[in-house]
Structures are given as C-alpha cells and as structure tokens.
Amino acid sequence: MKTDFKKIIMKNKIINTFLIFLFGVILGIFSKWLDNLSIDDSVWWQHILGILNLHNVFSLLGIWLLIAITISVFSKTPRRAGINVLCFFLGMTVSYHLYTILFCGFNPMRYMLIWYGFTLISPLLAYVCWYAKGKNKVSMIISSLILSAMFLSSFYIGIWYFDLKSIIDLLIFIETVIVLYVNPKNTI
C-alpha cells in the first residue's frame, strides 16, 4: 500500500515537472515568434497583440524572474523548486534558440550563452527563493532581496529621479509581491 502511494507521488512529480518544461518550451517558441511578428493593425488578432504589447513583455527580464519565482515558491520542497525552475528554463532557452536557428536563419550564440548561464544557476537561485515563503528572519531577508531585484527591474532610479519603466513592469512587480506574500496552499 505504501509503495503504491510513493509511486503515485513520484508519477505526479514527473508529470508536474514535465508540464513545467512544456510550459517553458511553449513560452520560448511564443516569445521568439512574437519577436519576429510584424504587427499589421488591419488584422484583428495582430491589432490585439499590438495593444497588449506582448512582444515587449517577453523581452523583459522581470517576466522571466516572476515566472521562476512563482514556480519556486509554489514547489513542495526546495529541491523540487530547483528541478522545476531548471526544467522551465531549459525548455524556454532551448526552444527559443532552436526556433531562432530553424526559422529565423541565424544563431545568436553569444546572446544565448547568457541565458544558458542563467539556466545553469537557476536551480540554486530557485532553491534559495523557495525559503522566501517562510515567516522567519531568513525568509524576510530573501523576500527583501527578491523584491529589491524586481524593484530595480521595474523602476528607473537615480540620485535625482524615480520613474516607472512601464505599466507592465509595475504589474510584474505587484504580482511578485502577491506571489511572495500570499500563503501558497497549493504546491506543484
């Protein structure tokens, strides 16, 4: 009876991780497709894409950080957080890179090396981010560091000025606050 339960749990972990990987693949392809799409306002669905400005949203570092933070915080354990975030970024970066090579006719290797490097360190960062959902001092420090990074990603800050980069950046920042401070009941 206990071994059957463990098999079911392991099967669910594998399925969840595969779905996260697939989500990364889909977002990688969608992101590159949007990069190459020239918007024609006379076509209704392209007009909507132009209004939503999605091609710029997926060019922001903040959206990718938000997705990784969300996956990490909603994972059951820090180890699962690392595995899930690694699989997400593997799916996203490899599909983006392959789409660029196969359909765009060029290989942005130097640019992709930055993302591959980020992918390699993402499990460690996810492992640490998982602890942000706690109630102790360490969790508060981790949450503060995450929010600081997202704050810098969302706002222009200087000695004499403070300005919002865009409404999308503000929404990403607000969503990060929600993800970090709402108690996650359902985990992946």
PLM regions with names:
Residues 1-81, 85-86:
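N-terminal topogenic module of multi-pass integral membrane proteins
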Residues 33-41, 97-106, 154-162:
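Juxtamembrane "helix-exit" motif on the non-cytosolic side of transmembrane helices
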Residues 77-102, 158-162:
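Cytoplasmic juxtamembrane regions at transmembrane-helix boundaries
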Residues 141-188:
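Terminal transmembrane helical module of multi-pass membrane proteins
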Residues 90, 94-152:
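Membrane-proximal helix-loop-helix units in multi-pass membrane proteins
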Residues 17, 51-64, 110-121, 165-176:
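Alpha-helical transmembrane segments of polytopic membrane proteins
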Residues 19-26, 87, 91, 95, ...:
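Lipid-exposed faces of alpha-helical membrane segments in multi-pass integral membrane proteins
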Residues 16, 124-138, 176-188:
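Membrane-water interface at the C-terminal end of transmembrane alpha helices
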